[in-house]
Amino acid sequence: RTQLSPEVRPAFFFADDVPTSVRDSLEFAFYAAITEWGNFGPIEYWVVGADTQAAERLADRFCEHRVQRGDLSQEECEEIGPRRAEFVEYASRAEAMLISGHPFIDAGWNGGLEWGLHLFSSSYPPGWAGLEDARPEDDQTVLFHEYFHAIQNAHLDTLDWSERQELMGPVWWVEGGAEFMAQVATSRLRAS
């Protein structure tokens, strides 16, 4: 799959409790990854905050967006309970993180190839949220790591999931490659 023009911008979707400063930091880092490695979109990036009701609303927006694009019917989207459950779980864990002060982040490349895009989701990024003992640099590296999975997947010419898994190779290779590339790129960019 070829790279897209830089004018084809990622679509970011944030829960309504995610502050503007966090949104701006995430978008800036994502554009840095695109500048570093090229634009392998179209891309959707869904970010949950720390409020479960806001996460529910984001899940509603996810379904509305899928229906509007013609990817799924409303009924099909509502049957995909794991996405809603994932958003609510992310918010619950982020709320606990803010109370405890123990940072964590869940993020992932979630496929989307059947809809002609790369789909990502993320919990509340603790470094960009300003949580003590959390470094924004770690959030940047996580984002670069996940974007590298889109690059890995963009170079496979089949939509058959089993065949894709076989072509990607062992999990340690896929994850190790993404982590290596993310660490090297973010370290170099921060040093420049």
Language-model segments: residues:
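Zn2+-dependent metallopeptidase catalytic core
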Residues: 15-105, 140, 144-147, 154
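Alpha-helical protein-protein interaction elements
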Residues: 4-6, 29, 137, 164-165
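Short, conserved catalytic or adaptor-binding loops enriched in Gly and charged residues
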Residues: 2-4, 35-38, 111
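Generic serine detector
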Residues: 5, 21, 25, 73, ...
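Acidic/histidine-rich, surface-exposed loop or edge segments in extracytoplasmic proteins
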Residues: 2-20, 121-129
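Zinc-dependent metallopeptidase catalytic helix centered on the HExxH motif
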Residues: 108-191
